[in-house]
């Protein structure tokens, strides 16, 4: 298991959630949940989430990943998920209306995200740059918040810090999906 030095625990993953997913997802995910719980890391960019609280957004926000299990939300409102069938991980980038496949291995995916020594893959696939740019002038969003573009990018918003506000994650994803439709990748 990868060591996460800046993890800020909010709460434990409910036991019923662990039991529900034990036979469905990687032992590494269960180990992560038991060791760390729900909270933030990677300077607040990554949020470990209860999948039960985001499963409805997966169904509403995309046509093709309804069976995927959401594991993390980023500080930019993207959902990192694991597919039930094959264990591959991916990221739904609501801000761009796109999906990117990541890796099959949970530990490698986490390492890809938090390795500050070799961040090229993270920059290419997770794209956290604007989050860290915003932190230079804005306070980090709370656990249930993220930075969102106002107006949203697909409606002409500009990808600049000046157009980023702190928004509620769920409401922001719902707004993007309501205004522009589900991700069709």
Give the label of every model feature segment.
Residues 90-126:
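Compact, glycine/acidic-enriched structural inserts
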Residues 1-91, 96, 141, 145-185:
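A surface-exposed partner-binding patch
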